[in-house]
Amino acid sequence: MVQGAMPVEAERFAQRLENPREEQIGGWRFWHGTVDGYPVVVSETLKGMSNAAAATAIAATQFHPVAIINQGTAGGHDPALKVYDIVLGKYSVNLGAFKTPAKTLGEGSDSRQWQPMDLLASKGSAGEDKKAHSLRQFPADPNLLAIAQSVKSDYRQGKVVEGVIGSADVWNSELDRIRYFHDSYQTSIEEMETASAAQIAAEFKVPFFGIRVLSNNITNQGKYDPQTGLACQDYVYQVVKAYIANLKKH
């Protein structure tokens, strides 16, 4: 299964399916077809963490994929990365799961003082759990990561690097906050879906991998380019073809 949140992140791949068939489940679109004769589903998850989780749960229960690739566009956190560069997510993190310090009225707020909160650390209250103060990492499936690395020389519109994908229902434009995330949690990019989809895929024990292209990077004045979403899908198509070829060998 290949996931993309917006039409510009999903429709190009769907158009490359052999014998495509579109299906609507609730608010989510799915395209069924084949790549090199192997069944592939493309999912338009819609934007945000809740939508990504729901679409992933639907996919896992309805289609039983052998693997899920969540891909699309992202904003840069690393000044060394340029628009059209692709990040292979060695892991993803939820940048929306934090606990604030106790402050009285008038003391203000500084998000750089917030503690990460691992909602999966226990079944009790995450706010009271002393062991929950870490940012959970959702690792890439090593086989999917290796296959993506094997075809990166085919991508000519930028470089392809391993990195950390940060996800949250937040659009960060404060450079100090972005630098804090990059320095503290090694985030390469930010978007709104990967960590959520990764969390649900892990619950269903489905191999998962996130691939993101930089559509903008305000840390180095990289201007937004919506065409990056098409470039990412073209690269992911090559990853899927290589993954299918590997499956057929075994």
Give, region by region, the residue ranges found by the protein language model.
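Proline-aspartate-enriched helix->loop->beta-strand connector
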Residues: 64-66
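A C-terminal functional module that forms or caps the active site or interfaces directly
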Residues: 168-210, 218-219
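Mid-sequence, gly/pro-rich, charge-dense loop/helix-turn segments that line enzyme active sites
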Residues: 78-182
